[in-house]
UniProtKB/Swiss-Prot annotation:
The gene is rpsB. InterPro entries: Ribosomal_uS2 (IPR001865), Ribosomal_uS2_bac/mit/plastid (IPR005706), Ribosomal_uS2_CS (IPR018130), Ribosomal_uS2_flav_dom_sf (IPR023591). Pfam families: Ribosomal_S2. GO terms for biological process: translation. Residues 267-288 are annotated as: Disordered. Belongs to the universal ribosomal protein uS2 family. GO terms for molecular function: structural constituent of ribosome. GO terms for cellular component: cytosolic small ribosomal subunit. This is Small ribosomal subunit protein uS2. Gene3D superfamilies: Glucose-6-phosphate isomerase like protein, domain 1, Helix hairpin bin. Keywords: Ribonucleoprotein, Ribosomal protein. SUPFAM superfamilies: Ribosomal protein S2.
Amino acid sequence: MSVVSMKQLLEAGAHFGHRTRRWNPKMQPYIFTARKGIHIIDLQKTLKSIDEAYDFLKNSVMEKKRVLFVGTKKQAQQIVADEARRCGEFFVNNRWLGGLLTNFKTIKSRIDKLEQLTEYVESEEFSKLPKKEQATIRRNLEKLEKNLGGLRGMKKIPDILFIIDPKKEEIAVKEANLLKIPIIATVDTNCDPDVIDYVIPANDDAIRTIMLIVSKMADAIIEGKEGRIETLEESSEVEEEEEEKDEVIDEVDEKLEAEEKYASYAEEVEEVEEEFIPSEIEDEDEKF
């Protein structure tokens, strides 16, 4: 069963593409028809692609892969931030910084600076600074937070990118392609699908469409993390069962060892009895 329904996609306006004169011919396989100069996306393919992307994300996250949400267009900014936070992943929703992936070492130093400044602003030492210096530091912190706030805690480049509108996020796409990082993206009729690994053909301008698709990808990540926890619990249970089995085996071994010792002792007693008791009986017979 699909994770979204045809009705949900229609109500969200996911089928509306761009004007026919603005289309990318490579999107032809994903277009159903054209009406009043606007391309209509084939939602059957959208349904299938959402399911494929969902399964890919879920399974990847179960393998401890990390995801970066990217959506800097106005309609997507808040949705991307909210859903990325909900599923505990990273996001960029203000501006893609060139080199974020290909020159991550430099970006990482700026992320570290953001975290250090955040701690400093909350310290007593900061409160003792002149008001003017405090204001300057706060402005720098706000600027860093705006561009890098969604990357806090990111220690290495992400394993997967999920992008809203790859045409707008062209630099992010190029960097990911260069590093062979898989990309999932909502792809409208004016985009190039060839640079995307998991194409979700859909209207990438409508807020309701963006909300629907982004929330489903976040759900996939949450499900993957829950599956990872369940797997860990199952493996933990298996380990406990194995430990219990080992304990039982040890107890049995101890009992067998004790029985063997007892049997050996019994044999020794029998030998002693055979050796000494008959002669004692003979001596007693002689007395009588």
